[in-house]
């Protein structure tokens, strides 16, 4: 209930609270991202609905780590809601294109099916321009089932947040 959490996260005049969107960067034999945040495709009006602070974005964070979008080899999706998958694509000449030009994207097939066939309760969270262009570009490796998808990286369907949300386990 709001009475419990509002002392720690007071809402603004539009009843929004400050939230962070964190991607996970893994560096080793490959350079990987788990999720990519909301991206930069939303209009100022759309971003304002959620109160997104666009002063710093994923490109800034990659640059701070000495990287660019071209350095990412693998992107793994926990699920395809816009605040996790919005950064998978960027606009180029009015078309959504893969944001990470040298990456393969690992997406759970059943999550993709749900995202491309949303129902009344979840359609506001799935935006096709975040993932359909990846399939069209041939850069998606669909995940079927649970287990290791790369050496030291396993995925497990947990459901809950979305029907096919997955946990990503990292072992090193």
Sequence positions of predicted segments:
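Metallo-beta-lactamase
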Residues: 53-67, 71-83, 99-157, 162
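Extracellular/periplasmic catalytic domains that process cell-envelope and extracellular macromolecules
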Residues: 17, 98-99
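Short active-site segment of divalent metal-dependent hydrolases/proteases
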Residues: 38, 82, 164
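Conserved beta-strand hairpin/beta-sheet module of binuclear metal-dependent hydrolase folds
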Residues: 1-64, 167-172
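Residue-level marker for buried hydrophobic side chains located in beta-strands
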Residues: 32-34, 76, 105
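Conserved G/P- and acidic residue-centered "switch" motifs that form tight phosphate/ATP-binding loops
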Residues: 35, 79, 161
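Metal-dependent catalytic neighborhoods of phosphoester/phosphodiester hydrolases
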Residues: 86-95
């Amino acid at each position: 209930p709001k009475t419990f959490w509002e002392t720690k996260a007071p809402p603004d005049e539009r009843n929004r609270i400050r939230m962070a969107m964190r991607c996970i960067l893994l560096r080793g034999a490959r350079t990987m991202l788990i999720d990519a945040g909301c991206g930069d495709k939303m209009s100022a009006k759309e971003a304002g609905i959620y109160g997104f602070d666009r002063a710093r974005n994923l490109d800034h964070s990659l640059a701070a780590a000495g990287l660019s979008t071209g350095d990412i080899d693998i992107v793994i999706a926990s699920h395809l809601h816009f605040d996790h998958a919005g950064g998978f694509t960027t606009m180029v000449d009015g078309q959504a294109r893969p944001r990470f030009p040298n990456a393969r994207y690992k997406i759970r097939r059943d999550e993709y099916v749900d995202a491309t066939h949303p129902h009344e309760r979840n359609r506001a969270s799935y935006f096709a321009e975040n993932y359909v262009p990846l399939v069209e570009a041939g850069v998606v490796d669909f995940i079927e089932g649970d287990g290791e998808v790369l050496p030291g990286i396993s995925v497990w369907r947990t459901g809950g947040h979305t029907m096919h949300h997955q946990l990503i386990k990292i072992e090193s």
